[in-house]
């Protein structure tokens, strides 16, 4: 769970309803991004696939449109796009709120909470006692394939006093358990974040219930990590193939509260080795470790228990860094569109690369395509297209000194502009005139990411547009910028232009996206 003082949260409800398929124009509701029908959600929790069903849990206030009364909301999907709301999975009760955590399958029933014929699914979460403001680690389990969850009677499984020797606040700042089974050592591993202490701690267990501290990963032990990156929260950890090498590496993903490229919180990932007790980080490169250069991609986690036949590492985050400030009245926040995370060499550097899940193609329809066409200064293409839910793909060869601009959600006085500036190889999102930016000092501005042409001089940009968001993927997905926007309904135009030189458009595909 993110620190209540860190304003980067969103919302969702826990009712068994169907996700609205069209934006509610009076409240900026997105068309194809996950949101609840009312109230508050922060980051996703316990992402897991059970059979053919994807489970999404999330931090949720079921009674108000602000942070508080935090439980685990729950929704399910068979395609990661059409979601059905389910009842609250882990409730806020007896003065203990259910903060962030993760889920995992216990196939050998090492926890003893199921049986050999029906092994349990387990969920670990931070218990936050409101009266004392203390945090401890707790366990819940499901023996009906994730439909309902029961809190372990022996909670907490790691008490504040057990955390205290490893936490300078005496255990008050230990949270967000990431738990997985480490087949190499035969132990269960828990990774805990220690907020303002800028460290993670690693614990082991043979039975998922009794835990022993093993080591800490501190900022000072990571070569190249800036001391300005503070407030570590929401850890994830997994092995990831390095494409083209036949090798894998361990990855730790987390959300610092400060120090991101766009200012404030953001998600970074580092590679390293893990021996079952200690994670040793590789030296980091500040230009490649951030997964998103926008303002609105926070608290990312990945789905687990995904079959090897699928093979994808799919992540999602909450899109909101402004607490309760965004100008929505019945909800706060939304889930980023699910994206794959890979690790590969791009040019001379190893990069984390991300792309929207391919399932998006099944709910989109091409509106206009262009191919092998030169665009020159003074021309405007795509101006006949209107839409607030789009998937726009542009691949082009820019002239030296040129700037290619894709303008989305364009109106009489509003627009969000995605630029590629050839001279400094920079991808940017300009929210200066994107609509309502009065709600927060950080709501406007320009966010940038480095994006080099490929070996042939080609630049590729993909933009997911929804009612109140843009997610921009550059190149193979090595440059990503995700931002909230709040334009008027009538600002639904599109434009493709170039200045400072020509650009040869290899391909353009504008697709309309609909869950119907």
From Swiss-Prot:
Catalytic activity: Endohydrolysis of (2->1)-beta-D-fructosidic linkages in inulin
Keyword Oxidoreductase recorded: no
Class of the enzyme per the UniProt entry, highest EC level: hydrolase
Annotated SUPFAM superfamilies: Arabinanase/levansucrase/invertase (SSF75005), Concanavalin A-like lectins/glucanases (SSF49899)
Applications: Plays an important role in biofuel production. Pure nonhydrolyzed inulin can be directly converted to ethanol in a simultaneous saccharification and fermentation process when combining A.niger and S.cerevisiae. Endoinulinase can digest fructooligosaccharides with high degree of polymerization (DP) values (>20) into short molecules that may be readily hydrolyzed by S.cerevisiae SUC2. Thus, introduction of an endoinulinase gene into S.cerevisiae will improve its inulin utilization and ethanol fermentation through collaboration between the heterologous endoinulinase and the invertase SUC2.
Signal peptide interval: 1-25
Binding residues for substrate: 40-43, 59, 67, 99-100, 175-176, 233
Active-site positions on this chain: 43
Gene3D superfamilies with a match to the protein in the record: Exo-inulinase, domain 1, Glycosyl hydrolase domain, family 43
Pfam family, one: Glyco_hydro_32C
Record GO terms (molecular function): inulinase activity; sucrose alpha-glucosidase activity
Annotated compartments: Secreted
EC number: 3.2.1.7
GO biological process, one term: sucrose catabolic process
Key words of the record: Carbohydrate metabolism, Glycoprotein, Glycosidase, Hydrolase, Polysaccharide degradation, Secreted, Signal
One GO location term (cellular component): cytoplasm
Positions annotated as glycosylated: 109, 372, 419, 424
Keyword Glycoprotein included in the entry's annotation: yes
Family statement drawn from the similarity comment of this UniProt entry: Belongs to the glycosyl hydrolase 32 family.
Role of this protein: Endo-inulinase involved in utilization of the plant storage polymer inulin, consisting of fructooligosaccharides with a degree of polymerization (DP) value from 2 to 60.
Cited PANTHER family: EXOINULINASE INUD (AFU_ORTHOLOGUE AFUA_5G00480) (PTHR42800:SF1)
Name of the protein in its database record: Extracellular endo-inulinase inuB
Gene name as annotated: inuB
């Amino acid at each position: 769970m993110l620190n209540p003082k860190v304003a980067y949260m969103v919302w969702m409800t826990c009712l068994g309803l169907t996700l609205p398929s069209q934006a509610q124009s009076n409240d900026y509701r997105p068309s194809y991004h996950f949101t609840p029908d009312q109230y508050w959600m922060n980051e996703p929790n316990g992402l897991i696939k059970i059979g053919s069903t994807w489970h999404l849990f999330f931090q949720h206030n079921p009674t108000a449109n602000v942070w508080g009364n935090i439980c685990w909301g729950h929704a399910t999907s068979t395609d990661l796009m059409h979601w059905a709301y389910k009842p609250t999975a882990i409730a806020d009760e007896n003065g203990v709120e259910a903060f962030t955590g993760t889920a995992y399958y216990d196939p050998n029933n090492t926890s003893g909470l199921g049986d050999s014929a029906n092994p349990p699914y387990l969920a670990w979460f931070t218990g936050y006692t409101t009266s004392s403001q203390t945090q401890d680690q707790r366990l819940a389990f499901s023996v009906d394939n994730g439909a309902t969850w029961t809190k372990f009677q022996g909670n907490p499984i790691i008490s504040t006093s057990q955390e205290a020797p490893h936490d300078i606040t005496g255990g008050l700042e230990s949270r967000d358990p990431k738990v997985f089974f480490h087949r190499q050592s035969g132990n269960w591993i828990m990774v805990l974040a220690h907020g303002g202490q800028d460290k993670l701690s690693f614990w082991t267990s043979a039975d998922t219930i009794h835990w022993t501290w093993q080591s800490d990963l501190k900022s000072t032990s990571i070569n190249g990590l800036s001391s300005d990156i503070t407030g570590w929260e929401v850890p994830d950890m997994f092995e990831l193939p390095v494409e083209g090498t036949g090798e894998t590496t361990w990855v730790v993903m987390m959300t610092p509260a400060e120090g991101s490229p766009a200012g404030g919180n953001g998600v970074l990932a580092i590679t390293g080795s893990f021996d079952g007790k200690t994670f040793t980080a590789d030296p980091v490169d500040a230009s490649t470790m951030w997964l998103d250069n926008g303002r609105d991609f926070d608290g990312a986690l990945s789905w687990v228990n995904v079959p090897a036949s699928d093979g994808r590492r799919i992540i999602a985050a909450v899109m909101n860094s402004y607490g309760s400030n965004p100008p929505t009245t019945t909800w706060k926040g939304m889930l980023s569109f699910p994206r794959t995370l890979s690790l590969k060499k791009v040019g001379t550097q190893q990069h984390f690369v991300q792309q929207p899940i391919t399932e998006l193609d099944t709910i989109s329809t091409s509106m206009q395509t262009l191919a092998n066409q030169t665009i020159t200064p003074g021309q405007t293409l795509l101006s006949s297209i209107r839409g607030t839910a789009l998937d726009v793909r542009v691949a082009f060869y820019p002239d030296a000194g040129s700037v290619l601009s894709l303008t989305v959600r364009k109106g009489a006085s509003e627009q969000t502009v995605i630029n590629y500036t050839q001279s400094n190889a920079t991808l940017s999102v300009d929210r200066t005139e994107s609509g309502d930016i009065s709600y927060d000092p950080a709501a406007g501005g320009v966010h940038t990411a480095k994006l080099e042409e490929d070996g042939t001089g080609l630049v590729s940009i993909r933009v997911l547009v929804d009612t109140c968001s843009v997610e921009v993927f550059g190149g193979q997905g090595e440059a990503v910028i995700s931002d909230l926007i709040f334009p008027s309904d009538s600002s639904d135009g599109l434009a493709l232009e170039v200045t400072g030189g020509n650009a040869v458009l290899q391909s353009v595909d504008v697709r309309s996206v609909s869950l119907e």
